[in-house]
């Protein structure tokens, strides 16, 4: 007899072998019908997999996150089933789960059209309605190769070639369609009803632009119809907030083919940039940072010495002059070490906090570029703290407090923290990495925050704390980082004089709050749907006259607002006021000021905030209200 321990601690006995599906059926018909898969001794398994020893078993249903991901993975296989029925010559490649969805890469003779995707979705619904079982068969490797050879699935054969040698592999049969996978998958297509194919894109085989282009069909799947509906509404809202669309509508920036991944900032967009940069500069000055500026281009030998050439050269732009080879900087950190090294440093100088709005360039693949979110030329709100080991925790706490306060000022109150640990490709010994990772854990503990850990996600020179903000649509964006580095000071020979008159290496803390300013502006545009809070808006007020009689008073109002520090524009066009209000509304200015004869006579302004009419206000009182609104946002938040 087998002893099966369930999550509530109860133990049930079964004849050996037993499956998760059989265990669920013995508990109740409702649970049996809802069973997607199981977790046996911590490992996810198919509902049909035999259990042959005493085990701890959890039954996975669509209510579990793992259940949702299994449904999504099975939907990807269903895409394959539908595609092969409609387009028999198509070659299936890979179909993984991604956040909130899945995709399948497919090789076709000609690109799919939106009409093709609609036909594939319709066929998937027809297949789901057949309510067929998904059958798993553990198949000898040689037989699996034969199956795919007979079906002409060349990409599956290439994938098998790359896999470790195994005696048997999981083959999942959707009627006549078969696909290979580690699994688990749903036992029946009834679990796949709440899905939607969302978009079509191109993707290179193995992500290499030198390889052939494939067709990528994206989709999503959920446990319930309501969850699917809510997701679709969220995606539709995200499309309305797309920073590329709003960037054009609000006249903030544009991109063009002649400068891929480089941004052309328009006056309003550059005004927004300057508001952010000046605000960050003020916060950094108050926190004890000294601003510096380092060269854009440095000799290749410098990057070899820092370790960037060995670990990062594929992402670096290079050039040559007078028989010397140079690289455009992808990061600011080595330059800051040079400033630290320029002069004899004492323990009394530590911590030394050097900040730079540093312009960097990285040779990102063209297919990965995406508006402001993924660019080749960008500016980081970068800073490096040179300190002793004893100062790590206090500096981390101060940084954490600064970061959280700034995020709140920008409207982000939900912040999660991750600790990224050593990657496979890295500089420095394991002892150094042990020390660095433990140092960041101690710092996080001192900050009193909860965190998750991400093995293999650290930078090549050190582990890092990642700060993720959640936006108005519930999406998570990684922005801030704090990285602990013992390696770069060693490689670039940074040192200071200790209290005992000895020489020692400083610890280097790499830190950013916004990350790339370009990307952060993209996030802000989408989070606020282009309707920026008053303190942040590139144009805070637009002042409009009803007739020419009020033009001079409008100029006086604008001058008074500008003298009080506000970014105000005039609209004195000879147009009807209704038209001017509608026309200016598309730019989503926080306030619209309308001036008629009555306002001019009484030294007042008629105020509109978005679509709300606030009535006629005394100008001085209105300025005081604006000042209080900004104080509340930046100080009281």
From Swiss-Prot:
MF annotations from Gene Ontology: ATP binding; metal ion binding; threonine-tRNA ligase activity; tRNA binding
Entry annotated with the keyword Cytoplasm: yes
GO cellular component: cytosol
Pfam families hit by this protein: HGTP_anticodon (PF03129), TGS (PF02824), tRNA-synt_2b (PF00587), tRNA_SAD (PF07973)
Catalysed transformations (reactions): tRNA(Thr) + L-threonine + ATP = L-threonyl-tRNA(Thr) + AMP + diphosphate + H(+)
EC number of the protein: 6.1.1.3
UniProt keyword tRNA-binding present: yes
GO terms of biological process kind: threonyl-tRNA aminoacylation
Subcellular locations according to the entry: Cytoplasm
Stretches the record annotates as Catalytic: 242-533
Keywords: Aminoacyl-tRNA synthetase, ATP-binding, Cytoplasm, Ligase, Metal-binding, Nucleotide-binding, Protein biosynthesis, RNA-binding, tRNA-binding, Zinc
InterPro entries (alphabetical): aa-tRNA-synt_IIb, aa-tRNA-synth_II, aa-tRNA-synth_II/BPL/LPL, Anticodon-bd, Anticodon-bd_dom_sf, Beta-grasp_dom_sf, TGS, TGS-like
Cofactors demanded by this protein: Zn(2+)
Record's signal peptide: none
Enzyme class: ligase
Free-text remark on how the cofactor is bound: Binds 1 zinc ion per subunit.
Residue sites binding Zn(2+) per the record: 333, 384, 510
Annotated TGS domain residues: 1-61
Family: Belongs to the class-II aminoacyl-tRNA synthetase family.
Record HAMAP family: Thr_tRNA_synth (MF_00184)
Its job: Catalyzes the attachment of threonine to tRNA(Thr) in a two-step reaction: L-threonine is first activated by ATP to form Thr-AMP and then transferred to the acceptor end of tRNA(Thr). Also edits incorrectly charged L-seryl-tRNA(Thr).
Quaternary context: Homodimer.
Protein name in the entry: Threonine--tRNA ligase
Originating species: Neisseria meningitidis serogroup B (strain ATCC BAA-335 / MC58)
Gene this chain is encoded by: thrS
């Amino acid at each position: 007899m087998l002893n099966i321990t369930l999550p509530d601690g109860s133990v049930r006995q079964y004849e050996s072998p037993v499956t998760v599906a059989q265990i669920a059926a013995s508990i109740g018909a409702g649970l049996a019908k809802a069973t997607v898969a199981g977790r046996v001794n911590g490992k996810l398994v198919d509902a049909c997999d035999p259990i042959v020893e005493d085990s701890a078993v959890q039954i996975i249903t669509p209510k579990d996150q793992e259940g949702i991901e299994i449904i999504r993975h099975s939907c990807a296989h269903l895409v394959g089933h539908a595609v092969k029925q409609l387009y028999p010559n198509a070659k299936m490649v890979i179909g993984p789960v991604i956040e909130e969805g899945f995709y399948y890469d497919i090789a076709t003779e000609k690109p799919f059209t939106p009409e093709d995707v609609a036909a594939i979705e319709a066929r998937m619904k027809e297949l789901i309605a057949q309510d067929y079982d998904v059958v798993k068969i553990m198949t000898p490797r040689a037989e699996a190769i034969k199956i795919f050879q007979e079906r002409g699935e060349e990409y599956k054969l290439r994938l098998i070639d790359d896999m470790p040698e195994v005696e048997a592999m999981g083959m999942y049969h959707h009627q006549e369609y078969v696909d290979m996978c580690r699994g688990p998958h749903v036992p029946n297509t009834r679990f796949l009803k709440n899905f939607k194919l969302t978009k079509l894109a191109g993707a290179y085989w193995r992500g290499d632009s030198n390889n052939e282009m494939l067709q990528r069909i994206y989709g999503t799947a959920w446990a319930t119809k309501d969850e699917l509906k809510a997701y679709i509404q969220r995606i539709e809202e995200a499309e309305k907030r797309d920073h590329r669309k709003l960037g054009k509508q609000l006249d903030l920036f544009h991109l063009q083919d002649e400068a891929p991944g480089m941004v052309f900032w328009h006056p309003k967009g550059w005004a927004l940039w300057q508001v952010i940069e000046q605000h960050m500069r003020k916060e950094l000055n108050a926190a004890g940072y000294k601003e510096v500026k380092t060269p854009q281009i440095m000799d290749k030998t410098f990057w070899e010495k820092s370790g960037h050439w060995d670990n990062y050269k594929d992402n670096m732009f290079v050039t040559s002059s007078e028989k010397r080879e140079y690289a455009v900087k992808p990061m600011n950190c080595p330059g800051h070490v040079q400033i630290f090294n320029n002069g004899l440093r004492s323990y009394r100088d530590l911590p030394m906090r050097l900040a730079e709005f540093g312009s960097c360039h990285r040779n990102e693949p063209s297919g990965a570029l995406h508006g402001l979110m993924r660019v080749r030329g960008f500016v980081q709100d970068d800073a490096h703290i040179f300190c002793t080991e004893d100062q790590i925790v206090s500096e981390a706490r101060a940084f954490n407090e600064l970061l959280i306060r700034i995020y709140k000022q920008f409207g982000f109150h939900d912040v999660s923290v991750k600790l990224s640990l050593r990657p496979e490709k890295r500089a420095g010994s394991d002892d150094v990495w042990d020390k660095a990772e433990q140092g960041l854990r101690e710092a996080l503990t001192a900050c009193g925050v909860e965190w998750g850990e991400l093995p293999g996600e650290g930078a090549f020179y050190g582990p890092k704390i990642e700060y993720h903000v959640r936006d108005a649509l519930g999406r998570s964006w990684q922005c801030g980082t704090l990285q602990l580095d013992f390696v770069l000071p060693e490689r670039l020979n940074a040192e200071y004089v200790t209290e005992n008159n000895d020489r020692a290496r400083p610890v280097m803390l790499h830190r950013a709050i916004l990350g790339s300013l370009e990307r952060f502006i993209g996030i802000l545009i989408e989070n606020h749907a282009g309707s920026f809070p008053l303190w942040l808006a590139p144009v805070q007020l637009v002042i409009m006259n009803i007739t020419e009689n009020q033009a001079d008073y409008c100029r006086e109002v604008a001058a008074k607002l500008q003298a009080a520090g506000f970014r105000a524009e005039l609209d004195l066009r000879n147009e009807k006021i209704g038209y001017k209000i509608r026309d200016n509304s598309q730019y989503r200015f926080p306030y619209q000021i309308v001036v008629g004869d009555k306002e001019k006579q009484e030294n007042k302004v008629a105020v509109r905030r978005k679509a709300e009419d606030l009535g006629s206000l005394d100008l001085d009182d209105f300025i005081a209200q604006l000042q209080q609104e900004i104080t509340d946002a930046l100080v009281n938040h």
